[in-house]
Amino acid sequence: MYVRHLGLRDFRSWAHADLELQPGRTVFIGSNGFGKTNLLEALWYSSTLGSHRVGTDAPLIRAGADRTVVSTIVVNDGRECAVDLEIAAGRANKARLNRSPVRSTREVLGVLRAVLFAPEDLALVRGDPSERRRYLDDLATLRRPAIAAVRADYDKVLRQRTALLKSLSGARHRGDRGALDTLDVWDSRLAEYGAQLMAARIDLVNQLAPEVEKAYQLLAPGSRAASIGYRSSLGAAAAAEVNAGDRDYLEAALLAGLAARRYAELERGVCLVGPHRDDLELWLGEQVAKGFASHGESWSLALSLRLAAYELLRADESDPVLLLDDVFAELDAARRRALAAVAESAEQVLVTAAVLEDIPAGWQARRLFVELRDTDAGRVSELRP
């Protein structure tokens, strides 16, 4: 799989871009702040419908514009597929697949399968659980695009149930059975969609675990072994059953958990049980990585998670596109060599670097230079002719 064309209109610092790409390695070189990362961000958005840098779409629209368009042509086993995504301020996003409008942007998921390595990856180890949940959900969706609908359904039910909890704290004490019966309905729906999402995550973690262990050993030979596990809000007592990933069990366990925590939920007005409170646990030896891993160990573990994702996607079908955003500058020589070795076998690798010296020695790659130019419409990124 490779991206043959990337087109941008008013995306971040790019007023206009039309890039013809090819298999193999391409390096975008430019000073920090010149917009090279925005190119990889656009490709990652086309792959996952989300940015690795911000949680909302509004910052992706260039200042002064009311919408942005990201267009890609992806080649997979000789077949071309065109995806156009329109991100609009204050309006629903739109998508076209092979120039035909689709009902939901989620229908383009799976066309471009990519793995992104970026400086922000340290948050996978050191950041909040939401970072690790997003890692799992993005990867699960790349492998099974239908998971996107499950995520959307769960998030919708979670918002509505939380709003109901906030409004019910007084009604509970007044004995408003009608309102509490409504909460029972939302409990059932939360458990249904939550069980589907948890089952997908747990299955993914079980497949990722050996790949993470192998990747970490490659990056840090002789170090403590790396391991991962899924920690649910259902508590340690149910860990073995939860990690089996049986959907019926998970649904029943979520319903029981919601019933057990109802008083606390009504008191606090928040939902305390469900996959939105789960985490991907990372271990080095017998020690939890977060808060205890060194900087080098944290980097190795973060890279291991990305390398494991790459291996799973590669095993599913064709090689995913590798996106490497300024990561070589962050790595020591050993980790550079390990990552470069993986990139050697990929069908397409797109890399950003501030200077040529950040690229591994001996790499044969097409070089494109990114510049920033002042115009009447502000400062815009351009490729040097």
Curated annotation (Swiss-Prot):
Superkingdom per UniProt: Bacteria
GO terms assigned for molecular function: ATP binding; single-stranded DNA binding
Family annotation (HAMAP family): RecF
Keywords, in A-Z order: ATP-binding, Cytoplasm, DNA damage, DNA repair, DNA replication, DNA-binding, Nucleotide-binding, SOS response
Organism: Mycobacterium avium (strain 104)
Any single biological process term in GO: DNA replication
One Pfam family here: SMC_N
InterPro entries reported in the protein's UniProt record: DNA-binding_RecF, DNA-binding_RecF_CS, P-loop_NTPase, RecF/RecN/SMC_N, RecF_2
Primary location group: cytoplasm
Gene3D superfamilies: P-loop containing nucleotide triphosphate hydrolases (3.40.50.300), RecF/RecN/SMC, N-terminal domain (1.20.1050.90)
Binding sites annotated in the UniProt record for ATP: 30-37
Name listed for the protein in its UniProt record: DNA replication and repair protein RecF
Biological role stated in the UniProt entry: The RecF protein is involved in DNA metabolism; it is required for DNA replication and normal SOS inducibility. RecF binds preferentially to single-stranded, linear DNA. It also seems to bind ATP.
Compartments in which it is found: Cytoplasm
One term under GO cellular component: cytoplasm
